[in-house]
Curated annotation (Swiss-Prot):
UniProt-annotated stretches for the region Disordered: 87-109
Sequence ranges of Basic and acidic residues compositional bias: 87-105
Keywords: Cytoplasm, Cytoskeleton, Microtubule, Nucleus
Name of the protein: Mid1-interacting protein 1A
Annotated organism of origin: Danio rerio
A GO cellular component entry from the record: cytosol
Tissues expressing the protein: Expressed for a short period in the cells that will produce the enveloping layer (EVL).
Domain of life: Eukaryota
Gene Ontology process terms (BP): regulation of lipid biosynthetic process
InterPro entries reported in the protein's UniProt record: Lipogen_MT_Stabilize_sf (IPR053719), Spot_14 (IPR009786)
Stated family: Belongs to the SPOT14 family.
Amino acid sequence: MQMSEPLSQKNALYTAMNRFLGAVNNMDQTVMVPSLLRDVPLDQEKEQQKLTNDPGSYLREAEADMYSYYSQLKSIRNNIEWGVIRSEDQRRKKDTSASEPVRTEEESDMDLEQLLQFHLKGLHGVLSQLTSQANNLTNRYKQEIGISGWGQ
């Protein structure tokens, strides 16, 4: 059961993160045997096109199966819930601080605001796509094990 969200909250980053986390948690609870996802193509139509168009394409995209998406989505969920490793953040700060040109405070404030807006829009879009992928993976898993109408 989904609750209707006010229009102002529908596009909020927090709401998008909660939708993503909910979709991944649902996926995690539904997928009881993740190893069944190995070698299952992400999209059946794409798989048919690969087999007919380019005989070597399956080798290049061998890792693009549902299990790799499952692992990736769970990893992203863990990063959102628990944060990324602190040492990676410190390393990035050192790399960016060494290469930044000197700016005035007013320019920095304006740049930071624009930069924040840019990243928030991008993050919202990425979270929406990841939520869709988690829901699709859950539905495909249900189809694969024969419970496609269960739990809706």
